[in-house]
Amino acid sequence: MGPPLAQELTQACNQPLAATSNLQPDDGYKIELRAENGVDKYPAKQHARKVAAQIRQGKGLIFLMGQKSTLHEDSDQERSLRQRRYFFYLSGVDEADCDLTYDIKTDKLTLYVPDFDLRRAIWMGPTLERKSALQKFDVDEVNYHSALDEDVKKWAKNQGPGSTIYLLHGSQGPTDNPSNVIIDTKTLKLAMDACRVIKDEHEIQLIRRANDISAAAHIEILRGITSMSNESHVEGSFLNTCVSLGAHKQAYQIIAASGSNAATLHYSKNNEPLRGRQFVCLDAGAEWNCYASDVTRTFPITHQWPSIEAKQIYQLVQEMQESCIALVKEGVRYLDLHFLAHNILIKGFLTLGIFKGGTLDEVKKSGASLLFFPHGLGHYIGLEVHDVSPQSIMAQGINDDSNNMLILPTCVSPCTTSSPALTSGMVITIEPGIYFSQLALENAKPEQLKYIDMARVKNYMAVGGVRIEDDILVTKTGHENLTKVPKGDDMLEIIRQGKKGNDSHHV
């Protein structure tokens, strides 16, 4: 069930790729994608210098191993490559069996590629060759892997006793560590995490492209949802569009959850029928050159709001998200946005009669809102979908006691008390949600149930869950929303126009 969008796109070097569809090309949503040929090299050398500056030592050797090619257990089939992200950050290389060194003192970044293997080249295609690798990647020198250990020994000899080799993990170092060097396995990760949290322009463009591809896939599903009958069709359509646009990998397991399945945060079966259900919650994001996107939209299976309750919950989540996004700028403490989202939820539930018999602060202190919004507002995004955070420092701001209940153990940076304030170059997600989980409600504490009208809640159980998620770049003047997928009434209009196109194809 391939989406028409994927069939219309032409991937020619230096040609724009327009995400249009013959279902309804005039619905106003076109995602323009441009081929990457001609884009500057991934700035590996710049990253190496940033990391060295964080290490704050005038000399030493950074040593990073790339991912090795391996077979599945008890099989002759290779595992799909997922490059080690720390290695990629200092190399830009997404190929197996490579390593690198960076000499801090001489500012020399060296890439080591596999030695030529004729048999493997015949079966799998040639691996990287020194000359082409030097042209392709932002490194100073390329050597074959067989020279690595000897090169490290020569470096250690020239440096003298007490020189330091910085490793990410003790098991990921030279085969034969020189005896006169210090092996440091703590400093490098902290330094790289501090660098990775602030994206440069090249990284932002990669995240932007991943988002554009994801947007094209999400929009195509909105256009076709009325003709789909199973969660698997939603997942298949998303994958089809992404692969057609050159994104062969997903940043994470696709969540295509309909009805009550959407109350399971990381639902992944994606195999149940859509009939009789109100919403689909689609959490899916393409990966581009190892950089992630993370996009969630919740939409009706028909071309209209399926119930008054569904519309009420959707609009409340949309208010939570848009209110939080509007406040994103440098200096803001992300955790305060998380608290704001809970406040909006509680006020909304008091208005709807789902919460009763208490003030906003009383309900908040009870933790009742956590039964319906049981995760953090979002996270960093980059080389990982839940990207690394800088070394924890106590963020400015005082935590109101009434908010303490809302800081969950599952909250990840920047949604923690120790996360730094938002800074230009950070890319974060804003992803509030409201879920009606039977399991959560059955295990609620008495102090939470005190403020919940369970008879009223029953009217909302069929909604399942609603989550809306965008990727937000923090800028010096505020923020930029990198996710170009419509919401609310604009979303419904695309579904309506898509239904017209689908109906015309069946005449």
Curated annotation (Swiss-Prot):
PROSITE patterns assigned to the protein according to its UniProt record, in alphabetical order: PROLINE_PEPTIDASE (PS00491)
Gene Ontology MF term list: manganese ion binding; metalloaminopeptidase activity
Listed EC numbers: 3.4.11.9
CC cofactor note: Binds 2 manganese ions per subunit.
GO biological process, one term: proteolysis
Annotated catalysed reactions: Release of any N-terminal amino acid, including proline, that is linked to proline, even from a dipeptide or tripeptide
InterPro entries per UniProt: Aminopep_P_N, Creatin/AminoP/Spt16_N, Creatinase/aminopeptidase-like, Pept_M24, Peptidase_M24B_aminopep-P_CS, X-Pro_dipept-like
Name of the molecule in the record: Probable Xaa-Pro aminopeptidase HCAG_02413
Lineage: Eukaryota, Fungi, Dikarya, Ascomycota, Pezizomycotina
